[in-house]
């Protein structure tokens, strides 16, 4: 399921270089890492800003390409932060969270919390309402820390 009908904010300037298979780190928090892809990156950044006000410093990792997965970044984040969370506008089975979990299981065992669409049928509605309904918006990410 993809909910990316929203107008999303511009995160990077025009000089940002992207490399296939290399994630981009946004912030350097050590309390948690939030791996996000697509429209959920801006939601993760909103949550990051709100969490900082509570004294919780998280890093957001923009997974702009899932395949090939950036194993190096996943392991680095697992070593450097206390919590790992993936968030995606996709089924929690077979998506970003699963790809990260596979790396962790094989290379550096660590707990991963997944935010996404549970294995259920989709709904119709406005994109932001659906993100809230399925619990993949900034509020849901923020609430993971309460």
Q: Which ranges hold each PLM region?
A:
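Thiamine diphosphate
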Residues: 2-146
